[in-house]
Amino acid sequence: GKSGNPFPWESGEVKSDKGCFYANFKPDRGNYTMDGSLITSKCGIFSANSNGLYDMAGNVAEWTSTVYVESGVESMSDMNPDLKYNAAKEDPYRLKRKSVRGGSWKDPESLIRSAWRGYEYQNQPRSYVGFRCVRTMISDTRGTSGRGKKK
């Protein structure tokens, strides 16, 4: 989120002052339907954030292509680490873990932050893990992201 906010919307709260939830997650112990969905919800049900983006938290946790290591990103020197390893069938099971980010419909609000990191085993389908299409912004030589016009 912006300015140290743990969530991708303006407030540090998970629901508005009118009681409307900002994302699909488990708001109460054992209560999966309080936010209006039993499991995953349709895209766009919750309000967009200040950038006009929908569903940036909750609903499903996100698969990443990054290998899960216990030490986390602290052991990597890059600001946007991408540690790859395509485990073979005969590799030990611990080498088949991929990092999962954010939380899902089955998780409490503390886990729907994109900073939350866990793992699942590759090639193991889960109803609470999905993916987002992302790409790296390519900068020109002046350090802009190509959004503005060049003079």
Task: Report residues per predicted region.
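Short, structured beta-strand segments at or near domain termini in extracellular proteins/domains
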Residues: 127-143
